[in-house]
Amino acid sequence: MRRLWTVGCFSRLIARHFSSVARRGERPGGEELSRLLLDDLAPAQRLERLFGLSPCLLALRAARRRVARLLLQAGKAGLQGERAELLRVAEARGIPVLRPRRQKLDALCGYQVHQGVCMEVSPLRPRPCDEAADTSSGDDPQQLWLVLEGLQDPRNLGAVMRSAHFLGVDRVITSQRNSCPLTPVVSKASAGAMEVMDVFATPDLPGFLQAKAQQGWLVVGTVGCPGPEISQSSKVPITSCLEFVWDRPTLLVLGSEGSGLSQEVFASCQLLLTILPRRHLPPGLESLNVSVATGILLHSICSQKKGFPVQERGQLLQDS
């Protein structure tokens, strides 16, 4: 017990020393001290390493994760701008700040593109789907929820979340089964949007869709460029995303990268949207990457959003 107490005190003392000189960009304590801090005092279980400037900064601002320590690459000139803000926020919250060399930080981040920034944090988990209804605005006829079934590529999921946040999607719902968890790779691919969005998960996606349809929501599935055989065999009407009219609360449902929507989810859809190509396509090129398709579909729908103040639009144009 005394040994554990001594190690704990030493760790806190060293962490304070690192934080006090972090502003100056120095590498305190030498290589041996850094190796002790980063290897021997390994992160506690159930922590993960979040990497990248935007994910780490947005995670600190949102304060939804527990942060064990912040790692800033040694030798980064000046710690200005967002890196300086990272340091200020971390020190204000008493978060230890370490300054490893790039080679060490590369290894800690699994050789991902980390931009000289990494944080050891508690994971983010999707919230139960019943909480989505509790926090929604039921009287808004132009609510748009994005529903994802079985997306497994973390970079696709991150890119989808980035587009959803940018274009004003109200909720993101995922299937619990066969879906990518909310990992640091997802957060990096989302440019940190994952850190500020509420993501919900349901164990019964077809049941969820059917329940929302009974509440008056329109369940809209998605399909690749339909050939004549698909158009004739489908019992669900198919329309171009450019012809879709958004006049009631809508669930936009996208399927997995390989197989698309499952039969159960497909059967729950009341309408199918497609993106029509601008040329004849050879076999194998009839569809788009799911994150690209999501951006196009969301933009075509969200451009119909009513009630966006003229003054606010003008301010956004001026700021850009």
UniProtKB/Swiss-Prot annotation:
Keywords: Methyltransferase, Mitochondrion, rRNA processing, S-adenosyl-L-methionine, Transferase, Transit peptide. It comes from the Eukaryota. GO terms for cellular component: mitochondrial matrix; mitochondrion. It holds the Pfam family SpoU_methylase. Residues 1-17 form a transit peptide. It catalyses: guanosine(1145) in 16S rRNA + S-adenosyl-L-methionine = 2'-O-methylguanosine(1145) in 16S rRNA + S-adenosyl-L-homocysteine + H(+). It is found in: Mitochondrion matrix. InterPro entries: Alpha/beta_knot_MTases (IPR029028), MRM1 (IPR047182), MRM1_MeTrfase_dom (IPR047261), Ribosomal_eL30-like_sf (IPR029064), SpoU_MeTrfase (IPR001537), SpoU_subst-bd (IPR013123), tRNA_m1G_MTases_N (IPR029026). Belongs to the class IV-like SAM-binding methyltransferase superfamily. RNA methyltransferase TrmH family. S-adenosyl-L-methionine-dependent 2'-O-ribose methyltransferase that catalyzes the formation of 2'-O-methylguanosine at position 1145 (Gm1145) in the 16S mitochondrial large subunit ribosomal RNA (mtLSU rRNA), a universally conserved modification in the peptidyl transferase domain of the mtLSU rRNA. This is rRNA methyltransferase 1, mitochondrial. It comes from Mus musculus (Mouse).
